[in-house]
């Protein structure tokens, strides 16, 4: 007795039409918060807002430039503001033209940029928080210094770092899903 097989997939009357020589290319999925989406734009403006608040707080303190860690925080916040504003403009362009960033080369640029700015922001926030703890707890010289403002600037930098790290993770996930 001969065994017969029954196909699991029923035949299609007309085969699908391919444009080009091979099967269709694999498309990247749009995750909420990925570049070129409304969530991505919200993340960019969140990064920009927190870093701008941190920058304004630090610049409003008269003697911040005498401490290297505070100067580094200001430099990283300037860099974070520029990066977030530029990518926010790209997100606005993508939303207005109804395009998305599905090119792996462009997404990898976002991934590397978010990774670098995230690392710099975290380092600046940690350095500023460490010096603030030193001034407040160890030296007990918080009276003449502006510890509350230093703490607020470091907290805003940490919030900016959180948004940048989330953006990095989503962009990295988008990049990994296309391969």
Swiss-Prot record:
One of its GO terms (cellular component) is plasma membrane. It comes from the Eukaryota. Belongs to the Casparian strip membrane proteins (CASP) family. Residues 136-154 are extracellular. Coiled coil: none annotated. The chain crosses the membrane at residues 55-75, 76-96, 115-135, 155-175. InterPro entries: CASP_dom (IPR006702), CASPL-5 (IPR045009). The keyword Membrane applies. Keywords: Cell membrane, Membrane, Transmembrane, Transmembrane helix. The keyword Transmembrane applies. Residues 1-54, 97-114, 176-179 are cytoplasmic. Pfam families: CASP_dom. This is CASP-like protein 5A2. It is found in: Cell membrane. Homodimer and heterodimers. PANTHER family: CASP-LIKE PROTEIN 5A1, CASP-LIKE PROTEIN 5B3. It is a multi-pass membrane protein.
């Amino acid at each position: 007795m001969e065994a017969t097989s029954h196909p699991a997939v029923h035949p299609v009357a007309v085969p699908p039409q391919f444009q080009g020589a091979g099967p269709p290319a694999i498309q990247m999925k749009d995750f909420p918060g990925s570049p070129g989406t409304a969530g991505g734009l919200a993340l960019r403006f969140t990064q920009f807002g927190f870093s701008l608040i941190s920058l304004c707080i630090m610049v409003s303190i008269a003697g911040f430039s005498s401490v290297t860690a505070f100067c580094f925080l200001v430099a990283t916040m300037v860099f974070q503001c520029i990066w977030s504003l530029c990518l926010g403009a790209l997100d606005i362009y993508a939303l207005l033209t109804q395009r998305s960033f599905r090119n792996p080369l462009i997404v990898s640029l976002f991934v590397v940029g978010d990774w670098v700015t995230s690392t710099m922001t975290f380092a600046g926030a940690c350095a500023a928080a460490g010096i603030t703890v030193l001034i407040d707890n160890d030296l007990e010289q918080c009276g003449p210094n502006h510890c509350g403002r230093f703490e607020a600037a470091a907290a805003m930098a940490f919030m900016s770092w959180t948004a940048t790290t989330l953006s990095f993770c989503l962009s990295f996930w988008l990049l990994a899903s296309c391969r």
